[in-house]
């Protein structure tokens, strides 16, 4: 099995609002359960650092951006749906691909063991 990738994420919020805090809590729960030890999360308050939001072309909050590994992906708005967050950032796809790769290798081995009718 290959080493796990490191995920670099940025969460853009607007102040200490209930919506911002809910987005942060949900995201931290997802990351700690699914990616413990292989992620870095930077929380950016666009009210305190508007230049960062402008540089990254952030127009709405909350916005979650996966910076690494490429490609960059963004989710804008509600982050309460775990599956939506993982799919939107291509994180669930990576997880499923690794699981399926293991299964595909087993299927290939099994197919090779089956004798053809010609033999």
Swiss-Prot record:
Q: Name one Pfam family in it.
A: KaiB
Give the UniProt record's GO annotations in the biological process aspect: circadian rhythm
Sorted UniProt keywords: Biological rhythms
Entry's InterPro entries?
Answer: Circ_KaiB, KaiB-like, KaiB_domain, Thioredoxin-like_sf
Superkingdom in the source lineage: Bacteria
Misc remark for this entry? The kiaA gene has been eliminated from Prochlorococcus during genome streamlining. It has been suggested that the central oscillator in Prochlorococcus does not have to be as robust as in other cyanobacteria because the former live in specific niches of the Earth's oceans; they divide exactly once a day and at the same time. Thus gene loss and changes in kaiB function compared to other cyanobacteria, can occur.
Q: How does it assemble?
A: May undergo a major conformational rearrangment; in the free state forms homooligomers. When bound to KaiC switches to a monomeric thioredoxin-fold (KaiB(fs)). The active oscillator complex is probably KaiC(6):KaiB(6).
Q: What is known of its domains?
A: Has 2 forms, fold switches to a thioredoxin-like fold (KaiB(fs)) when bound to KaiC.
Q: Which family does it belong to?
A: Belongs to the KaiB family.
Role played: Component of the KaiBC clock protein complex, which constitutes the main circadian regulator in cyanobacteria; it may modify the ATPase activity of KaiC. May be a metamorphic protein which reversibly switches between an inactive tetrameric fold and a rare, thioredoxin-like monomeric fold (KaiB(fs)). KaiB(fs) binds phospho-KaiC, and perhaps clock output effectors.
**What is the protein name given in its UniProt record?**
Circadian clock oscillator protein KaiB
Highest classification ranks of the organism: Bacteria, Bacillati, Cyanobacteriota, Cyanophyceae, Synechococcales
